[in-house]
Every structure is written in structure tokens, then in C-alpha cells.
Amino acid sequence: MAIASTELVEREIRIDAPPSVVFEFLTDPAKMVRWMGTEAVLEPWPGGRYCVNPTGHEPASGKVLEIIPDRRLVFSWGWEGGALPLPPGQSTVEIALEPDGDGTRLRLTHRDLPPDMHSFHGLGWDYALPRLAVVAAGGDPGPDPVRSITRSTLMAARSLPPRYLYRLGRQRLRTRTSGRPQR
């Protein structure tokens, strides 16, 4: 079993939608797959199942640990299938929503990741959260190229140096919508 690290993946983003709308995109499976994944199962109560399949090959799954409507969602996270060294439920994702004017400030903390999985998950959230912001604000985030990642590509990405993953992630973020650079 991989050893968890004390380092955190932390992200923050402002979304031009009220917390109630953002919360729906975090907890309604039909809305969730509009910004992340090919399929999702989410039982929005403590102990309920949390499962999202970003690529169509290796679902991430865990349990809902805490849920406060329109304010907070905490769930365990890990990958089924063994392609990544993070079994289901081994790490924890905490999402806090705060009103910010007419929008929402979303703060995400992903903890208990093995050291070799920080960059991978950091880039994953760097990719997914802007897509959430677009769809929650009523926009179309466009096609999701992550859905076309093969299992072998997923395994190979694990071994890339963090600086390469960072550059790759920044390039994808800059070109994610309508051809205009997004920074």
C-alpha cells in the first residue's frame, strides 16, 4: 500500500453562480458529467457512494463523509482497477463553498495522497475546476479530451516528471475554451 503524504493539493476558484447551483453540479450525477467524467454515481448522504469515471476506463470512488447542502462536500477518493497507486477511499477531498458577491468561492483540499500522486491529482483539479466554473455559470465547457485517455496513457502519465506535467496541464488550460487563452 502506498504511504500517504502530509502535503496537500489545494485549489481555489471563483465561480459566477450562487453556491446552490455549484452544489448541484457537485452532487447531481447528471450535472456532474457535464464537467467531469463519462459517468457518475453520487449518493448525497454520509456513507453514500461517490464514484466518477473521468476517462471511461478507471473510475475514482469512495464514500461521502460529510455533506452540508450549498456549503460543503467531503468524500474519500481513490482509483479502481489498480492502474494508479491509490486504492478507492485512500485519500480525502474536501470542497467548501462560500458566497462571493453574486458568485461562489470554491476551495478544494485533496489530502492523504501518496507523494508520487500529488502532481497527477493537482493537474486533474486544475483541469476540472475551470470546466465546473464554465458549466455552473451556464456555459459550455466544450468536449472533454480526458474522456479519450487510454489506460496505458494514464499509467504512463504517472511516471512523467512534475515539471512536464505542469507544462502539459498549463497548455491544456490555456486552450480549453473557444481557442482563447485562459490564464
Predicted segments, located by residue:
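Short, solvent-exposed secondary-structure boundary/capping segments
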Residues: 71-78
